[in-house]
Design a protein with these regions (language model features):
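DUTPase catalytic domain/fold
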Residues: 1-228
Length: 228
């Protein structure tokens, strides 16, 4: 969705010491901390800003079980990629570009108009986003501090119907950038059975404080699968 609103929300419950956590047996109100980053946002009662996931036990399979699942139902597709499984499936960045214009993705414009979340399909994405194209054979992209980008994964991935998945940070030590703003993948994402071709993951990316250089094929996150 090229009209991503770049809206950061966190769940708060009474008596808790962490964001986005609700203790077992909790009964009471829930609150949302809402922080628009790039665009000014208009919200109304009933707008959906967060997704709640309920977990019981440890639904994440081991790496061995994930490799076995990949053998039976491919999780990663593409002749130039293979399943990098270590604490989840490694997700790398595609900076080769697609189409005749070698499109890499989009960067959010500054000082754009207000976004009314109730007006679905109303806005022209070009009013909020500028395209980024590959230049020559460098296959690198310099992230400007605190700019917001939409890029895609090099891998085409699948989530079987009896699984869900979440994109988590690869390693905080590799740099001050974040790629998992839109981190949840629903059951059946990119899935069409054994013969499926998968779908590229859309990555919402921001660098913090300092410029950061991304290179084509650099691992930026891991897709952690959870059995339903």
């Amino acid at each position: 969705d090229v009209c991503s609103s770049d809206l950061f929300t966190r769940l708060i419950a009474d008596g808790t010491t962490e964001f986005d956590r609700v203790r077992a047996g909790y009964e009471g109100p829930l609150y949302a901390e809402i922080s628009p980053r790039t665009f000014s946002i208009l919200v109304r009662t009933g707008d959906r800003l967060s997704q709640l996931r309920l977990r019981k036990g440890n639904p994440a399979p081991s790496d061995a079980a994930l490799r076995d699942l990949h053998q039976r139902v491919p999780l990663v597709h593409g002749g130039d990629t293979s399943a990098n499984i270590d604490g989840g499936v490694g997700i790398s960045i595609d900076l080769a570009g697609t189409g005749p214009e070698a499109l890499l993705g989009y960067r959010a414009k500054h000082h754009a108009d207000l976004i009314d979340l109730s007006k679905i399909g109303h806005y022209d994405p070009r009013e909020f986003w500028e395209p980024i194209h590959a230049h020559g054979d460098s296959r690198t992209l310099i992230l400007n501090p605190d700019d917001f980008y939409i890029l895609v994964s090099r891998e085409r991935v699948s989530v079987p119907p009896d699984f869900a998945a979440e994109l988590v940070p690869y390693d905080p030590l590799v740099g001050e950038f974040r790629v998992h703003y839109a981190g949840f993948f629903d059951p059946g994402f990119g899935y069409a059975g054994v013969e499926g071709q998968g779908t590229k993951a859309v990555l919402e990316v921001r660098s913090h404080d300092v410029p950061f250089v991304l290179e084509h094929g650099q691992v930026v996150g891991r897709l952690v699968y959870e059995r339903l």
